[in-house]
Structures are given as C-alpha cells and as structure tokens.
Amino acid sequence: MLETEGFIQKVKGKKSIVLEKKNLENISLTSIQTVQELNKLQNINLETDLISLYIVQGDKKLMKKFQVSESADFYKVVRTNSLNGEVLNYSTSFFDRKIVPFLNEEIAKKSIYEYLEKDLKLKIGYSRRDINFRKITPEEQKYLKLKDINMVVVIETHAYLSNGTLFQYETIIHHPEKFTFTVIAKR
C-alpha cells in the first residue's frame, strides 16, 4: 500500500526507501480521503463546518457537467475545513440526487463519503482533479481571510462511482500558504 501511494520505493535485494513523509502540508493528489481518514492517518483534528446545504434545480452548467436533463436536481453543500481555528479550505460540492437521494446537516458535517459507502452501499471508484489558480471571490475571502493575498489554489474534482457514473462535482478553494500538494512521479 505504501508503495502504491508513492511513500516508499521497494528495491529488490535492498531496504525500502522512504520517498516522503505525509503531513498536513503535503497532501497526496492520488488518493481520495475524507477528513476523518486524514485526521486518523495524520493524528490531527481538522474540523468541518457546514455553511449551507440546499437543493439546486435546473442549473445549466451543472446539467452539462453531469450530462443530465433539465429535470435534474442536485444537493449543494458548502463547507470549510479548519485546523486550530484557522480555515484552510472552502469547498462547494454538488451531488446528483438521482444517486444521492438524501443528505442532511448531520451527514454533511460528519462524512458524506462514509454515508455513501456504508449507508447507501455505493462504491466510489475514482476522481479527476484539475488544479488552477485564480483571484479569490468575496465569499471565499469571508471565510479564508487572506490578508495580502488575492490568489487561491482551486482543485476542481469530478468524482465517479466504480461503474463510471459521475456522482459529485466539487471545487475546493485552498489557502495558498497552508497546503502543499505532492505527486510522486516514476520513470
């Protein structure tokens, strides 16, 4: 597992080589982890705050992303993650209600993925992540409170079930001074 995650390299006839130490400032882009899993793995206490949870109907951009008709509706979940009282990221997630028919405040505060996997018995397969940088919006600034910084790191995620069905579209706005993302490249 450590080898497939890119943390060690096994060399035949030799000891394993540690490639990186995973910590909060060095989060892998190659795995899908919940806040609870990250807390346990790194022995930290990231806290999730729910800002809003409501249903969105007939949004043309979302319908195009999810490749669905106008009758489709989605849950919109806006949250922040904090460490020691400092907001590290601001996320906006959309879940297809045909796949995720019910969400409430308790689930959104705890772990949506745990609910999907354990209660709904969905098999989460993979995600596509696009990383870009842009100017911060007033809404994001309200929560991230960047002083002299007007740019943010944006990770746009399309998450799919194991059968290839898109069930979540998310943008996570990261405080640019609080995270370093790492991918181990192999030849």
Which residues are covered by each model-predicted region?
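N-terminal helix-turn-helix
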Residues: 1-18
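All-alpha effector-binding/dimerization core of bacterial HTH-type transcriptional repressors
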Residues: 22-187
